[in-house]
Structure formats: C-alpha cells, structure tokens
C-alpha cells in the first residue's frame, strides 16, 4: 500500500528509475459532482448511491466526469519506455521538472544539460517470441548472458564516446546522438483519471513490454489508493 509518506516507487528495481506521485486534484466525489451538475445536484460525502452512479457512468461509457480529477507524476524511465509513454499524451499533459503547463510533452533536455551515466540494464535478456513480432519470452541461455555482456559494454562505450565528443567541444544537442535507448530520461506527467486508467489498461497487459508494465503497475497502485471507486469501475469497463 502507498501512503502519503511513501509516494515514490522504483518499478524496475535498479534504484534509478522511479515514479513519484507529485500531487492529485479531486477524489471520487469529483466524478459524482461533475456528473450531477447537469441536474444541479451535489454530494458532500460519498454514499452507496454515489458509487452506483460511478459504476453506471463507467459501464455506459459516460467518461467526461472522469476527466475532472487529475494526477501529476514525476517519472524517470529509460528512453524506450518514455517513447512508448509519449503515445498517451492525448488527454494528458507533460512537463519537465519545474512549473506545470497545461499541455504538451517536455522532459529533461539533452540540449541544455549533460546526461548522467544512468542506464537501464535488465537482469535477464529476453528472447524474441516466435508467435508475435512484438512479444518476447524469458531466457536463461548462455547466448542471452553473452548478449547481456555485449549490451553492458556497448552502453559503457557509448557514454565514453559521448564524453569525448563533449570534451572536443561538440554541442550537447549533437553529442547526445551516440547515447543508447536505455539512457534514463525524466519528465512530469499530468493526466486525467480517465487517461491514467487508459494507460494502465493498455500498458499493464500481457502483450505489453515488461518494463513499461512495471511502470503501469505503479500508476495503478497510486490511482487505486486515491480514487478507489472511480478507478476500479473505469478499469473494469475500458
């Protein structure tokens, strides 16, 4: 369980990548009252009747009331995870560390800052699945262990080349071109409750990549703690 005192999780277990719940706006009553405003109604406390209304809204795809509650996350993830995440910007807002903006995608810029030597290295490399172009399967073969060594060596060498380019005076915006896709990046994500539910439904799925699934699970736990009724019915009906 996540509490107010413990609002940071480390999805990949490497002590580098994280999801931090920065702030939230609204609660389950936000969904209820935004729906009832059509009739001039308002609830002060969440009742069983209100929960039935939330269930009805979700089951019948009346989704606009779920867009009035928001969550803001600070995320540190490998580039390949962030690029998948980018596809979910519809109905959400992204901003780099600092003041939030109302829309768009912003993250730490390699044009302005020098990248730290922070890279995601999986504990186990997976083999390509024969049944699907986008699926993978676990492997503990010697071949995969050799591939892991290759990945580690390439990552280390790419950062060395990055540093050499910077030392030669090459601009950061161009020197970064040698960095691999497992380089860590950082961004803020502000999203409606509906957008968070949609992200979790698609990315915490058996066909999704393992790494982004772990991030989706972290978001799921935060949303379930903050919006227990609304988020549960949204997930059941997406």
Q: Which residues does each PLM region occupy?
A:
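Family-specific signature for flavin-dependent thymidylate synthase
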Residues: 1-238
């Amino acid at each position: 369980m996540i509490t107010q005192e413990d609002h940071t999780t480390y999805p990949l277990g490497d002590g580098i990548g994280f999801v931090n719940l920065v702030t939230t706006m609204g609660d389950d009553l936000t969904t209820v009252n935004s729906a009832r405003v059509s009739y001039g109604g308002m609830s002060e406390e969440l009742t069983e009747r209100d929960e039935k209304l939330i269930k009805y809204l979700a089951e019948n795809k009346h989704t606009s009331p779920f867009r009035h509650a928001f969550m803001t996350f600070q995320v540190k993830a490998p580039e390949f995870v962030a690029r998948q995440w980018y596809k979910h910007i519809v109905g959400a807002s992204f901003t780099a560390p600092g003041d939030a903006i109302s829309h768009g995608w912003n993250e730490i810029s390699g044009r302005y800052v020098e990248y730290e030597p922070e890279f995601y290295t999986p504990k186990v490399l997976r083999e390509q699945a024969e049944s699907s172009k986008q699926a993978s399967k676990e492997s503990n073969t010697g071949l995969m262990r050799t591939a892991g060594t290759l990945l580690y060596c390439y990552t280390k060498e790419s950062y060395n080349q990055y540093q050499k380019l910077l030392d030669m005076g090459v601009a950061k915006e161009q020197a970064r071109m040698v960095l691999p896709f497992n380089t860590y990046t950082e961004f803020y994500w502000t999203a409606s409750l509906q957008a968070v539910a949609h992200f979790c439904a698609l990315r915490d799925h058996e066909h999704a990549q393992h790494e982004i699934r772990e991030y989706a699970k972290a978001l799921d736990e935060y949303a379930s703690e903050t919006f227990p009724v609304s988020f549960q019915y949204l997930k059941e009906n997406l």
